[in-house]
């Protein structure tokens, strides 16, 4: 299974691709897309859409795992993140790739075992799990963490699907 993890943001959008399953995951690619604040909003969104669509076409992931950010204290930040989130959803819909959202606590629990893990613990676990020596960007690290979280949740999703099919 190939999973694209997405840490949504307008100024910085993290993307990370992993392949494998919960027992053995392999790093394929990661990047942090950056848009300039001087760019007009349509140009920023277009750039993000084009790059996400390009990765979807090139790697053909089976799923996308995106951070579900429930609460933002600053309305303007929430609005901008929401626009980036929407652009990713559009690219996924156009490519026919299902999206799965995970909250920050789910990611922390999945990778570290506690919902109170800090950023350094997450980065350490991503690097250790994928055998990456250098990971310079927090947004890309978050994206890879989301992809790994999705892989970890796959056995539970499969069991739930089988149970639902038996009940029907």
From Swiss-Prot:
GO terms for molecular function: crossover junction DNA endonuclease activity; DNA binding; magnesium ion binding. Binds 2 Mg(2+) ion per subunit. The active site is at residues 7, 67, 139. Coiled coil: none annotated. Mg(2+) 2 binds at residue 67. Mg(2+) 1 binds at residues 7, 139. One of its GO terms (biological process) is DNA recombination. The keyword DNA-binding applies. Its cofactor is Mg(2+). Belongs to the RuvC family. Homodimer which binds Holliday junction (HJ) DNA. The HJ becomes 2-fold symmetrical on binding to RuvC with unstacked arms; it has a different conformation from HJ DNA in complex with RuvA. In the full resolvosome a probable DNA-RuvA(4)-RuvB(12)-RuvC(2) complex forms which resolves the HJ. This is Crossover junction endodeoxyribonuclease RuvC. It comes from Deinococcus geothermalis (strain DSM 11300 / CIP 105573 / AG-3a). The lineage of its organism: Bacteria, Thermotogati, Deinococcota, Deinococci, Deinococcales.
């Amino acid at each position: 299974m190939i999973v694209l993890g997405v840490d949504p943001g307008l100024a910085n959008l993290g993307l990370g691709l992993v392949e494998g399953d919960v027992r053995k995951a392999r790093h394929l690619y990661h990047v942090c897309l950056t848009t300039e604040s001087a760019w007009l909003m349509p140009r920023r969104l277009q750039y993000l859409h084009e790059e996400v669509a390009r990765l979807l076409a090139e790697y053909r992931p089976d799923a996308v795992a995106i951070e579900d950010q429930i609460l933002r204290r600053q309305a303007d930040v929430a609005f901008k993140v929401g626009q980036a989130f929407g652009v990713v959803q559009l690219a996924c819909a156009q490519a026919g790739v299902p999206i799965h959202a995970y909250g920050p606590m789910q990611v922390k629990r999945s990778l570290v075992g506690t919902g109170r893990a800090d950023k350094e613990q997450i980065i350490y676990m991503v690097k250790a799990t994928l055998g990456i020596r250098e990971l310079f960007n927090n947004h890309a690290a978050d994206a890879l963490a989301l992809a790994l979280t999705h892989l970890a949740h796959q056995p539970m999703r499969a069991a739930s699907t089988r149970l639902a099919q038996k009940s029907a």
